[in-house]
Amino acid sequence: MRRVWLALLAFLGVACITAAIAIPAFLVPQLRVVPLDLDITSVASTVPADGSAGERFPAVIFDRCSVSQPKARTLDAHLTQQRRSVIIEPSDKRQATLQSAQTVQIDRIRDADGKETDPPAPRADGDLKCDDGLLTATIDRVSVNRKTSVPNGTVSALQLEAAPEGVNVKDVSVQLPDRKGFQYKFGFNVKKRSYLYYDLNTRQDQPAKYVGEKTFNGVKTYEFVSEVPETDLSSLPNAQGEACLLYTSDAADE
């Protein structure tokens, strides 16, 4: 009986060692995929190009109320971007489709005379005016390979306007078939090298260059910088395939 117990204990010991080795080898590849319960909310504010803090008006935006005037104007502004990304269908063991709803809110503006204004919140009826605080609102949908996080082309579309009841979302969306770069999530096992980054505003893939390491809240991170070239956004097509022009003759006092 003693031999049996020793043999049993020896077997269990080997089994435990085997399990200790096999489980991580099995679990790690399974865990290194885009999770299907992904739900991320982020908030970011504009900062000057040099990254310094304290500037009240670090951005410059087009004065939409000047579109019908003889001369277009710009405004100094402070902006806040809010984004929520979740997983939607089609998603399975090979791919995950991310839906990212994003708004850019104008917190405050300053005109050429130095007058500061807090723009009004969007109106309840959804009718946008040229002086509204809502600058942009979009819903982006993109399918990615769960192992690499690279877009696979199954779904790649940008919704630019609300879809009324009975209207297919595709009818108010722009298809983005050539998207290749990372966007909402980097891949796994990131190296100190350049990667493609997809800039949704200009709808272009741009290189994101590794520039060094930074520590945030005690966590060591890699910093990547992407320089997006100046782009005429008015030439980008809308859902109807036409060049975008958000405002025509709206005035602030209408």
Q: Residue ranges of each PLM-predicted region?
A:
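Conserved small/polar residues in nucleotide/adenosyl-binding loops
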Residues: 247-253
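Extended beta-strand-rich segments in extracellular/periplasmic secretory proteins, especially
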Residues: 85, 95, 145-246
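Solvent-exposed N-terminal domain segments of exported/luminal and surface proteins
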Residues: 2-158
